[in-house]
Amino acid sequence: EFAPNNRFYANQRRVEVDQINMDLAKYISYRFCSECHYLQPIDAIHQDEKLNCPKCRSAQWNDSAQKQTLLSFSQVIATTEDAASRIDDSADERDPKFYVRQMLVNFEREAVREAWKLKKEDLPFGFEFISKADFSDINFGEVNRPGPEISIAGSSRVRPGFRICKQCGKVQNRYFSQDDINAESSWEHAIDCTYRDSNDDSFILNVHLYRHFSSEAMRILVPYTKSGVSDPVIQSFIAAIQLGFKLKFGGRVDHLRFSEQNTPDLIADGRRHYILIHDSVPGGTGYLHQLLSGTAETMLDLLKKAYNHIIDCPCKEEPEKDGCYRCVYQYRLSRQMDNVSRSSALEVLKELLENDVEWEKVETISDIQINAHLDSALEQMFLNSLKKLTRKNGLPSIRMIQEIINGKTGYIIEIGDQCYNIEPQKMLGEDEGVSIKSKP
């Protein structure tokens, strides 16, 4: 709400945040991991941690792009000329701002107080209670503004940041406007700023806004179903879990926040997808642990309630609908609605609940074995499509055999007289002609 350039409306006036009080602000350089959620102040990085991420060992940890400046602040200032601030409520002049936001979550293994896994080797699923997790809520700048594309926690996005004067905190929009790029009036300073008459940009500080807080949390592994793990599967399952919480505990869960988290798999290559539920009350209320401590049956009951509600929803009588606001569309993150569907939610829940459900206690769900070499449903579909090409359109016979390739599960594919190795999620580097280590 208090980000630079955001607008406030009251008493038929519109004012825009154009300054941060630097007396009540602090900025510090952090290094971000491109693959996992880990971040660390530059000054706190030890010598042996400079080349690879201390958490996931990512080789991109030391890239210059992973070093960014974060700013925490307590007060902003909005100044607008009287005439320019006046608006007419009869006209819809409200123009909302959208920002590149990302929540990074870190916790120690010892913080996992209780963890359960489903005793189905072919269906990896489980959940755990985390007594203390550290959250970093970061605003990387306005959407659609130009800036560098940076990968953080497996998400590659344009992150323009905010440019401000490092002394007076005035917002500098000059860099984002081609029309006034050379105009002297483009520089913005407070009247008493020592850089007011500066002819260069030495006073510019490019920052990302952040806040840190700690709370208790619950983490649920998204099931690796027969359909794989795709955005529709993830978002539909989040919607089902949120619905299950509401049905099980009523309106007493309004302070809980639901989000998606994906991390690199430290057991095998690929990524793991989780639903993260955290208490919006800093420090936590003890509510999550109270709800699901001691037994996994509460989670089972929650899943059953969600399944029964969705399958009995009246929208099943309307073939053109794949969900409604009485079932999965109650999901709060409206920007993900396109990926939420009744059929996807039912497919996941049905696989979890079919046959007898047995639970087993584990140290953490991070240890649950999954076939993470197939990092997405798209990769699985690609392999399935290869098999279906046999003897079609003049192609020779195609045979695929599961095999261990370079120490992990892969495939040998025979196409006529030719034979190829398929190694999922292979790391490419200089030996393969790739300058920056990455996975295709």
Regions found by a protein language model. Name each.
Residues F8, K439-P440:
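Metal-dependent nuclease catalytic cores in nucleic-acid-processing enzymes
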Residues E1-Q12, Q19, L24, N52-D375:
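Extended, highly charged accessory segments
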Residues E379-E430, V434-I436:
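Active-site metal-binding core of divalent-cation-utilizing nuclease and nuclease-like domains
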Residues P41, Q60-A65, G251-E260, K387-E403:
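Short secondary-structure junctions
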Residues S58, K426-M427, P440:
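Short beta-alpha junction loops
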Residues R7, Y30, R219, Q402-E403, ...:
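Residue-level detector of beta-strand face positions
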Residues D23-L51:
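Short peripheral tails and domain-boundary helices/loops at the edges of structured domains
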